[in-house]
Amino acid sequence: MPTRDDLIKRRIAESEKAGKSTGVIVRGLQAVAYGLVTDWLTGNIDTEGGRIKYTAKNLGRVQGLFSVFQKFQKEYENTVLGSVLDWAGRLFGLNEQYFDTFDSPAESVADAARRLTLQRWGYNTLTGELIPGGYFQYLFSNANIGQRVAGLVNQAIAQKMPLAQFQKTFRQVFVGAPGQGMLERHWRTNSFDLYQRIDRTANLVYADRLGLEYAIYSGTLEDDSRPFCIERVNKVYGRDEIAHWADLQFAGKPKIGYDPFVDCGGFNCRHHLSWVSNEIAAHLRPDINKQKAEK
């Protein structure tokens, strides 16, 4: 029977594993997109002597690239969303196990945790669709990538670049080394702590429904951990103390929309809030009972 600490560690490890797994999927889809673009170039752009011709006809055809990206976008969205929902489901399961160790039954909270967590990040569990204007819709959108690719093709046409040279150069720019491709950079920049935030949100829904007042700032420290996290890791905090973080200024804090209960240490924070009962909180932090007595 895993202990509460074991389940905290599992949630943290699963969040890390989820991020790496989805990153691999994004890189694979990036290779698919590269193939689609190069196939389109071969079939649609006129060349002469192996060089791309600088003609109004070629420049006008570049618009067709957007249709290629629109079709790819649907495949990308469905595949990556499937991965996110799968890993989110595992995190929901671990959160349910975690709260099953409490005296209060968590069964009735499980569905609400899934629904409210995914809703917060832009997915409607009732319709199975992305919420317009939500975080997921922005995360899965690669319209700016399509514009950049079209710009590169326009430059190649203007320079009458050899098609083979462009394909090689484009591969270096679009795919690049692992983690450095266009789609990968967009994904990593905007989703670095996605699964950590999903876990924090689910844990908070349970805490709200079960009336829990204290949380452990869970996780480990890395070489690049910021002072905010170094000061708080593995310590217990009450809701009022956590809410007060919104009034602080610290490295990594988003300038707009910071929610201390979900964002913790801000951009790229890998720590979690693990909510505990008052009894456990008082055991881990004896001054809590003293504070209550003084109120």
Model-assigned labels for residue ranges:
Residues 1-179, 276-295:
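N-terminal leader/targeting and assembly helices and adjacent pre-domain segments
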Residues 180-286, 290:
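Acidic, glycine-rich two-metal-ion catalytic cores of nucleic acid-processing enzymes
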